[in-house]
Curated annotation (Swiss-Prot):
Keyword Ubl conjugation assigned: no
Major localization listed first in the record, in broad terms: membrane
Protein's cellular compartments: Cell inner membrane
InterPro entries, sorted: HtpX_protease, Pept_M48_protease_HtpX, Peptidase_M48
Protein name (record): Protease HtpX
Organism annotation: Klebsiella pneumoniae (strain 342)
UniProt entry keywords in alphabetical sequence: Cell inner membrane, Cell membrane, Hydrolase, Membrane, Metal-binding, Metalloprotease, Protease, Transmembrane, Transmembrane helix, Zinc
GO annotations of cellular component type: plasma membrane
Stored Gene3D superfamilies: Metalloproteases ('zincins'), catalytic domain
Cofactor-binding details, from the entry: Binds 1 zinc ion per subunit.
Active site feature: 140
E.C. number: 3.4.24.-
Length: 294
């Protein structure tokens, strides 16, 4: 219920801002061109801002600390491993951070391949062997080398635009049909504003769920490729061993907004369709079969 309430409040805020911008710019919401322009701005705007601020937001979310100078042998090993793998993958040295969490996890983020961040949990450093940890780091390096963060932003922007545009087009038609078109009376050609808002809200919820299935599919798909990238960098057996170790880990404690960036996603979900990560057994089987190594 809380998520639905937050969605409705967010949608209300977006529609208010949306309406204000349309009014200030003089764009008629009944104009398909104007509506598409605003849908593109709102659809891509949030995704691009999130991407540009991703390192700062990620570090704040988990309370991570960037290693400026290694203070002990573990940090020296971590910095050396990241530097070595980044060179192998042909990318610039990412920033390296450690955050306190009991679960075995790590993530990579950043707006560009050559301005990225790799962060690992204390649980990973304490509970994984060096070979297993190397494989996890290689998985994150592969995400960066593959440009997954930018691709996810583009996909999210496209589906956001689709949701905003289609929802409002249908809402506009419904409001005009059910509430009557009052443009001749000097009022908005959107028809009854209450019907418009109600229909747009419901459709955004429905289309938003469908859109999340698309983004979650891509998120799972890129995990298979990052696993394969890790196997190429450090060896298939090391990556398989790392995934097997993840099966014994605590349930991830990272915020839901961070799950798509972590190597270990939450296992519990109503359906695999809404999972950011494939089940660990499927990832292990994909490595053993070499499906994504071809």
């Amino acid at each position: 219920m809380m998520r639905i309430a937050l969605f409705l409040l967010t949608n209300l805020a977006v529609m208010v801002v949306f309406g204000l911008v349309l009014s200030l710019t003089g764009i008629q919401s009944s104009s398909m061109t104007g509506l598409l322009i605003m849908a593109l701005l709102f659809g891509f705007g949030g995704s691009i801002v999130s991407l540009m601020m991703s390192k700062w937001m990620a570090l704040k979310s988990v309370g991570g600390e960037v290693i400026e100078q290694p203070r002990n042998e573990t940090e020296r090993w971590l910095m050396h491993t990241v530097a070595q793998q980044a060179q192998q993958a042909g990318i610039a040295m990412p920033q390296v951070a450690i955050y306190h969490a009991p679960d075995i996890n790590a993530f990579a983020t950043g707006a560009r391949r050559d301005a990225s961040l790799v962060a690992v949990s204390t649980g990973l450093l304490q509970n994984m062997s060096r070979d297993e940890a190397e494989a996890v780091i290689a998985h994150e390096i592969s995400h960066i080398a593959n440009g997954d963060m930018v691709t996810m932003t583009l996909i999210q922007g496209v589906v956001n635009t689709f949701v905003i545009f289609i929802s409002r087009v249908i809402a506009q038609i419904a409001a005009g049909f059910l509430g009557g078109n009052r443009e001749d009376e000097g009022e908005s050609s959107n028809g009854n504003p209450l019907i418009y808002f109600a229909v747009a809200t419901v459709l955004e919820l429905v289309f938003g769920i469908l859109a999340s299935i698309i983004t979650m599919w891509f998120s799972r798909h890129r995990e298979f490729h990052a696993d394969a990238g890790s196997a190429r960098l450090v060896g298939r057996e090391k990556m398989i061993a790392a995934l097997q170790r993840l099966k014994t880990s605590y349930e991830p404690q990272e915020a839901s907004s961070m799950m798509a960036f972590c190597i270990n996603g939450k296992a519990k979900s109503m359906s695999e369709l809404f999972m950011t990560h494939p089940p660990l057994d499927k990832r292990i089987e994909a490595l053993r079969s070499g499906e994504y190594l071809k």
